[in-house]
Amino acid sequence: MTRASLPVSVKAVSWSISRQPVLHNLSFEIAAGETLALLGPSGCGKSTLLKLLAGLNQPESGEIWIGDRCVASARHSLPPEARQLGMVFQDYALWPHMSVGENVAFPLRMRGVGKKPREEQARAMLARVGLEGFTARKPAALSGGQQQRVALARALVAEPAILLFDEPLSNLDRDLRETLVHSMKALLRQSGTTAVYVTHDRDEAEIIADRTLHLAQGQIVSITQSSGEPYVFSQAR
């Protein structure tokens, strides 16, 4: 990737819904090029925090910085397109009427990149995620794992400074999840992109992340370093 990755700083951020606190005074840092997993049970605030980072919600208090720029506070919030983000969702979010190549090239099209260069970049990115030759296919013809690779290629093609993942593998079976999480880790290391990876699965967090932030009831319980050792999914699931 040619665009430099950026650090992220979350400073005393809180958020509530209908006056019920969801996130409580969260503060943490993510180094440029680091992958941080957000781990915790359903309802602990993982996806809410990701939405704040993405610009889909605004903090009630505190600040979020990307690089040397405050992108969100109680007073202002930059929209997602102004934050140099790429996003990968649980449901893939592919357009069924578009080909695989058109889906991957869409962020480049929105930036005004010409047809030929964006097609070339889309083909190159599909090759990087192991889908060379899939350009003309429609998403409906692909398996779940292949669709998630297309979603990852689309997120990476515009060279984002930060990637946000919202439980991207939770709809897939165990063996496929293990294969894909190792592939995603390799791509993140190769690209050097800063990433935030939401999951409820400790195995995924241990494999893909440099560190894991453990959330419970909207508060940080701990931030742990991944072992760095070769790791496989637990047998007992």
Where are these regions (language model features)?
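ATP/adenylate-binding site constellation spanning eukaryotic-like Ser/Thr protein kinases
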Residues: 82, 192, 217
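Helical segment within the ABC ATPase nucleotide-binding domain
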Residues: 177-191
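Conserved H-loop
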Residues: 192-198
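The feature captures the ABC ATPase H-loop/switch
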Residues: 200-203
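A short, surface-exposed alpha-helical micro-motif characterized by mixed small hydrophobic
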Residues: 205-207
